[in-house]
């Protein structure tokens, strides 16, 4: 898949499933090659997890996961749009309802309202406006999104203010 090109690991494996590439590189990963949607999530026991991290690119799947985590009472953090940005210093953690200048977050809020969602969850986002459409993703920013999420989750799990 050409979207592998913005990933540090696996970028040379266009056409292969990301989960299988990562499972070969990191033996502790159990690859699940599935489309994340409401049907998949309905049979998935989220309650057994301490925290759920969303790094899905598909809006419908992001909404389904947020709703299921809310229903299950599971802590949840979601990654918003990191593409078309160059400055990792502009990455921040905010409520989904308080992001600014992030088209993906705006779409997520719209869809959450349509579903009658009145809850809240934190997101990792950037205050940097997205640049020109032709610009892809800069690994320095997308990787930093992942590091921000990892730090956020660890701090929450050990009881620190995130």
Please name every model-derived segment.
Residues 1-162:
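Adenine nucleotide-associated cytosolic modules
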